[in-house]
Protein backbone atom coordinates (compact mmCIF):
# COMPACT_ATOMS: atom_id res chain seq x y z
CA UNK A 1 0.00 0.00 0.00
CA UNK A 2 1.29 3.47 -0.81
CA UNK A 3 0.25 6.88 0.51
CA UNK A 4 -2.90 8.38 -0.97
CA UNK A 5 -2.32 10.80 -3.86
CA UNK A 6 -3.12 14.51 -3.57
CA UNK A 7 -5.80 14.26 -6.27
CA UNK A 8 -7.53 11.33 -4.59
CA UNK A 9 -7.36 12.95 -1.15
CA UNK A 10 -8.76 16.17 -2.54
CA UNK A 11 -11.81 14.31 -3.95
CA UNK A 12 -12.41 12.44 -0.70
CA UNK A 13 -12.62 15.70 1.27
CA UNK A 14 -15.65 17.00 -0.71
CA UNK A 15 -18.28 16.30 1.95
CA UNK A 16 -16.62 15.18 5.16
CA UNK A 17 -19.09 14.08 7.85
CA UNK A 18 -17.93 14.03 11.49
CA UNK A 19 -20.14 12.43 14.15
CA UNK A 20 -20.35 10.79 17.55
CA UNK A 21 -23.34 9.33 19.40
CA UNK A 22 -23.94 12.61 21.27
CA UNK A 23 -24.22 14.70 18.08
CA UNK A 24 -27.56 13.17 17.08
CA UNK A 25 -31.09 13.28 18.37
CA UNK A 26 -32.02 10.34 16.11
CA UNK A 27 -30.40 6.89 15.88
CA UNK A 28 -26.79 7.66 14.84
CA UNK A 29 -26.49 4.49 12.75
CA UNK A 30 -29.52 5.57 10.73
CA UNK A 31 -28.14 9.12 10.42
CA UNK A 32 -24.84 7.76 9.05
CA UNK A 33 -26.64 5.47 6.60
CA UNK A 34 -28.72 8.39 5.30
CA UNK A 35 -25.60 10.55 4.99
CA UNK A 36 -23.88 7.81 2.99
CA UNK A 37 -26.94 7.44 0.76
CA UNK A 38 -26.86 11.22 0.28
CA UNK A 39 -23.24 11.14 -0.86
CA UNK A 40 -20.74 11.91 1.93
CA UNK A 41 -17.24 11.15 0.69
CA UNK A 42 -15.46 10.43 4.00
CA UNK A 43 -16.54 9.88 7.63
CA UNK A 44 -14.82 10.71 10.92
CA UNK A 45 -15.75 9.02 14.18
CA UNK A 46 -15.51 11.67 16.91
CA UNK A 47 -16.84 10.44 20.26
CA UNK A 48 -16.10 13.35 22.61
CA UNK A 49 -17.76 15.72 25.04
CA UNK A 50 -20.78 15.49 27.29
CA UNK A 51 -22.57 12.14 27.21
CA UNK A 52 -19.94 10.50 24.98
CA UNK A 53 -19.56 6.72 25.14
CA UNK A 54 -16.43 5.30 26.77
CA UNK A 55 -14.59 1.99 27.07
CA UNK A 56 -16.06 -1.08 25.44
CA UNK A 57 -19.27 0.72 24.45
CA UNK A 58 -17.27 3.28 22.48
CA UNK A 59 -15.32 0.57 20.66
CA UNK A 60 -18.48 -1.40 19.79
CA UNK A 61 -20.18 1.75 18.50
CA UNK A 62 -17.13 2.63 16.38
CA UNK A 63 -17.17 -0.87 14.87
CA UNK A 64 -20.85 -0.54 13.94
CA UNK A 65 -20.22 2.78 12.19
CA UNK A 66 -17.14 1.40 10.45
CA UNK A 67 -19.11 -1.58 9.12
CA UNK A 68 -21.70 0.77 7.58
CA UNK A 69 -18.96 2.89 5.94
CA UNK A 70 -17.44 -0.30 4.49
CA UNK A 71 -20.79 -1.21 2.88
CA UNK A 72 -20.62 2.07 0.97
CA UNK A 73 -16.88 2.03 0.30
CA UNK A 74 -16.38 5.31 2.18
CA UNK A 75 -13.20 5.83 4.27
CA UNK A 76 -13.62 5.61 8.07
CA UNK A 77 -11.35 7.98 10.00
CA UNK A 78 -10.88 8.04 13.79
CA UNK A 79 -10.55 11.36 15.61
CA UNK A 80 -7.65 11.76 18.01
CA UNK A 81 -7.10 8.12 18.92
CA UNK A 82 -4.29 6.39 17.07
CA UNK A 83 -4.56 3.24 19.20
CA UNK A 84 -8.26 2.83 18.38
CA UNK A 85 -7.58 3.53 14.69
CA UNK A 86 -4.97 0.75 14.68
CA UNK A 87 -7.17 -1.65 16.66
CA UNK A 88 -10.04 -1.18 14.19
CA UNK A 89 -7.76 -1.08 11.15
CA UNK A 90 -9.43 2.24 10.29
CA UNK A 91 -8.60 4.00 7.03
CA UNK A 92 -6.93 6.83 8.88
CA UNK A 93 -6.78 9.19 11.82
CA UNK A 94 -7.31 12.92 12.36
CA UNK A 95 -5.33 14.74 15.04
CA UNK A 96 -5.31 18.24 16.47
CA UNK A 97 -2.41 20.38 17.64
CA UNK A 98 -2.76 19.22 21.25
CA UNK A 99 -2.93 15.53 20.43
CA UNK A 100 -0.11 13.08 19.78
CA UNK A 101 2.62 14.62 17.60
CA UNK A 102 2.25 14.20 13.85
CA UNK A 103 5.65 12.48 13.45
CA UNK A 104 4.76 9.66 15.82
CA UNK A 105 1.24 9.43 14.33
CA UNK A 106 2.64 8.99 10.80
CA UNK A 107 5.10 6.37 12.06
CA UNK A 108 2.35 4.32 13.69
CA UNK A 109 -0.20 4.73 10.90
CA UNK A 110 2.12 3.70 8.06
CA UNK A 111 0.55 4.64 4.71
CA UNK A 112 -2.95 5.25 6.06
CA UNK A 113 -4.63 8.67 5.86
CA UNK A 114 -3.42 11.25 8.38
CA UNK A 115 -5.26 14.56 8.75
CA UNK A 116 -4.19 17.43 10.98
CA UNK A 117 -6.11 20.45 12.31
CA UNK A 118 -4.11 23.63 11.75
CA UNK A 119 -4.71 27.28 12.61
CA UNK A 120 -1.50 28.94 11.42
CA UNK A 121 0.84 28.74 8.42
CA UNK A 122 3.62 27.46 10.71
CA UNK A 123 1.43 24.61 11.97
CA UNK A 124 0.45 23.80 8.38
CA UNK A 125 4.05 23.65 7.16
CA UNK A 126 5.11 21.50 10.11
CA UNK A 127 2.21 19.08 9.48
CA UNK A 128 3.05 18.82 5.77
CA UNK A 129 6.77 18.22 6.43
CA UNK A 130 5.91 15.46 8.87
CA UNK A 131 3.50 13.50 6.74
CA UNK A 132 -0.01 14.98 6.80
CA UNK A 133 -2.22 13.97 3.84
CA UNK A 134 -4.66 16.81 4.39
CA UNK A 135 -5.27 19.77 6.69
CA UNK A 136 -8.41 20.71 8.57
CA UNK A 137 -8.50 24.52 8.63
CA UNK A 138 -10.79 26.52 10.90
CA UNK A 139 -12.96 27.27 12.66
CA UNK A 140 -14.20 29.16 9.59
CA UNK A 141 -17.48 30.20 11.25
CA UNK A 142 -18.69 30.15 14.88
CA UNK A 143 -19.67 26.66 16.02
CA UNK A 144 -21.61 25.29 18.98
CA UNK A 145 -20.46 21.67 18.54
CA UNK A 146 -16.91 22.09 19.83
CA UNK A 147 -16.48 23.95 23.10
CA UNK A 148 -12.69 24.24 22.93
CA UNK A 149 -12.24 25.89 19.56
CA UNK A 150 -9.74 28.57 18.64
CA UNK A 151 -10.70 32.03 17.34
CA UNK A 152 -12.91 32.07 14.25
CA UNK A 153 -10.77 32.56 11.13
CA UNK A 154 -13.42 33.28 8.52
CA UNK A 155 -12.86 32.44 4.86
CA UNK A 156 -10.01 34.99 4.79
CA UNK A 157 -7.95 32.71 7.04
CA UNK A 158 -8.47 29.87 4.61
CA UNK A 159 -7.62 32.00 1.57
CA UNK A 160 -4.44 33.11 3.38
CA UNK A 161 -3.23 29.48 3.53
CA UNK A 162 -3.51 29.22 -0.26
CA UNK A 163 -1.86 32.62 -0.77
CA UNK A 164 1.09 31.43 1.32
CA UNK A 165 1.67 28.51 -1.04
CA UNK A 166 -0.02 25.73 0.94
CA UNK A 167 -1.07 23.33 -1.84
CA UNK A 168 -1.95 20.22 0.21
CA UNK A 169 -5.67 19.24 0.23
CA UNK A 170 -7.65 21.32 2.75
CA UNK A 171 -11.05 20.75 4.33
CA UNK A 172 -12.83 23.69 5.97
CA UNK A 173 -13.99 23.11 9.55
CA UNK A 174 -16.36 24.91 11.90
CA UNK A 175 -19.90 26.23 11.64
CA UNK A 176 -20.31 25.14 8.02
CA UNK A 177 -23.86 24.88 6.67
CA UNK A 178 -25.53 24.44 3.28
CA UNK A 179 -25.82 28.24 3.06
CA UNK A 180 -22.13 29.04 3.51
CA UNK A 181 -20.52 26.01 1.81
CA UNK A 182 -19.87 27.88 -1.46
CA UNK A 183 -17.87 30.57 0.39
CA UNK A 184 -15.58 27.93 1.90
CA UNK A 185 -14.89 26.24 -1.45
CA UNK A 186 -14.37 29.58 -3.20
CA UNK A 187 -11.80 30.54 -0.54
CA UNK A 188 -9.67 27.55 -1.54
CA UNK A 189 -10.92 24.48 0.34
CA UNK A 190 -11.26 21.12 -1.42
CA UNK A 191 -14.26 20.26 0.71
CA UNK A 192 -16.31 21.01 3.80
CA UNK A 193 -16.52 19.11 7.06
CA UNK A 194 -19.76 19.23 8.98
CA UNK A 195 -21.29 17.81 12.12
CA UNK A 196 -24.69 19.32 12.93
CA UNK A 197 -25.52 20.31 9.32
CA UNK A 198 -26.11 16.57 8.82
CA UNK A 199 -26.41 15.05 12.31
CA UNK A 200 -29.20 17.39 13.44
CA UNK A 201 -30.89 17.85 10.05
CA UNK A 202 -34.54 16.90 9.70
CA UNK A 203 -33.39 14.60 6.90
CA UNK A 204 -29.70 13.68 6.94
CA UNK A 205 -30.14 12.34 3.41
CA UNK A 206 -31.61 15.57 1.96
CA UNK A 207 -29.14 17.76 3.82
CA UNK A 208 -26.19 15.71 2.53
CA UNK A 209 -27.48 15.82 -1.03
CA UNK A 210 -27.68 19.62 -0.84
CA UNK A 211 -24.13 19.86 0.55
CA UNK A 212 -22.86 17.62 -2.26
CA UNK A 213 -24.60 19.85 -4.84
CA UNK A 214 -23.19 23.04 -3.28
CA UNK A 215 -19.64 21.67 -3.28
CA UNK A 216 -19.75 20.45 -6.88
CA UNK A 217 -21.30 23.73 -8.02
CA UNK A 218 -18.55 25.75 -6.33
CA UNK A 219 -15.49 23.69 -7.24
Swiss-Prot record:
Pfam families: TMP-TENI (PF02581). 2-[(2R,5Z)-2-carboxy-4-methylthiazol-5(2H)-ylidene]ethyl phosphate binds at residues 143-145, 175, 195-196. Pathway: Cofactor biosynthesis; thiamine diphosphate biosynthesis; thiamine phosphate from 4-amino-2-methyl-5-diphosphomethylpyrimidine and 4-methyl-5-(2-phosphoethyl)-thiazole: step 1/1. Its EC number is 2.5.1.3. Its cofactor is Mg(2+). Binds 1 Mg(2+) ion per subunit. It catalyses: 2-[(2R,5Z)-2-carboxy-4-methylthiazol-5(2H)-ylidene]ethyl phosphate + 4-amino-2-methyl-5-(diphosphooxymethyl)pyrimidine + 2 H(+) = thiamine phosphate + CO2 + diphosphate; 2-(2-carboxy-4-methylthiazol-5-yl)ethyl phosphate + 4-amino-2-methyl-5-(diphosphooxymethyl)pyrimidine + 2 H(+) = thiamine phosphate + CO2 + diphosphate; 4-methyl-5-(2-phosphooxyethyl)-thiazole + 4-amino-2-methyl-5-(diphosphooxymethyl)pyrimidine + H(+) = thiamine phosphate + diphosphate. GO terms for molecular function: magnesium ion binding; thiamine-phosphate diphosphorylase activity. 4-amino-2-methyl-5-(diphosphooxymethyl)pyrimidine binds at residues 44-48, 79, 117, 146. This is Thiamine-phosphate synthase.
